[in-house]
Structure formats: C-alpha cells, structure tokens
Amino acid sequence: MGYMAKESRYDTMQYNRCGASGLKLPMVSLGFWHNFGDTGHYDNMKAMCRTAFDHGITHFDLANNYGPAYGSAERNFGQILKDDFLPYRDELLISTKAGYDMWEGPYGNWGSRKYLIASLDQSLKRLGLEYVDIFYHHRMDPETPLEETMGALDSIVKSGK
C-alpha cells in the first residue's frame, strides 16, 4: 500500500485567503528552488513532501528553471505526485512560474507570450498535470510590453491550464 496522508493534517494549520480569490494558502508553503533538483536525494524529497502534507502544508511552489538542472524540480515533484499524491490532487495548491533563463535563443526567458505559454506547457509535461493552480510571471520584462505578458497570462487562465 502506498502513502496515506494523516487524517489530522488539517487540525492545526491556519489558512488565509489568497487576495480576493477563492484560494486559501497555508501559513507555510513548501518551495522547491534548490531542494528538489537532480543533486538532491529522491527519498528525502519524497519524505519532505509527505511530512509537509501530513502537517497541513498544501501549497507546493515551483518554477520552470528550479533545479539544478533546469526543470528537474518539476520533474522530481511530478514523480512524487504520481507516486504518492494523485489521490490528494484536489487538496493541493500547486504553483509554478516562468521568466528566467530556461533554454537558448531569443525566447528562452523573460515575458513574451511565446515564452510564457511554451514554459507552462513544458512545466505541465514535467509535472504530469493538466493544470496548475497558480502560474506566476517570475519577473518584469523590460522589453516586452506589460499588455503582452498580462494577455498571455489571461489566455493561460482561460485555457484552463
């Protein structure tokens, strides 16, 4: 039998509304910046996720370039999701983001529509998911009009990703 979350996981964690949305964030989130790359130990990653969720931490925060190597944190967490957390997907708040270097060429970072949509599509593949709950633009782009960046994010939300 696989992982079974503690029944008491929601007994002590406090949750706060995320802005004016219907989402509620736990007081503590688990971020995967340099903790879940290929240089880490998979069993430790899995244990961290289990312990976090067993204590009411439902928000798991990633980015397309978290690792090292780029994308490896999403891939490793995607495997943990598949192994342990798919039965609990509706209880999880999974976020990822894009904006920093990810691949070579003029569309490998920043905030163009092309980069953001391609980044999210790649993130979803690595995570093994059809959607994320929050997709952030990681930083301002001095060369792309804000309207283009915001339009891309709006399109992503409307597409259900």
Regions found by a protein language model. Give the residues of each.
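Ser/Thr-centric signal marking residues that sit
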Residues: 58, 62, 96, 144, ...
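Residue-level signal for alpha-helical context at structural boundaries
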Residues: 94-95, 153
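N-terminal binding-site loop/beta-alpha segment at the start of enzyme catalytic domains
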Residues: 1-92, 158
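N-terminal small/glycine-rich loop or linker at the start of catalytic domains
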Residues: 19-37, 95-108, 131, 136
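Glycine/proline-rich, positively charged
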Residues: 101-161
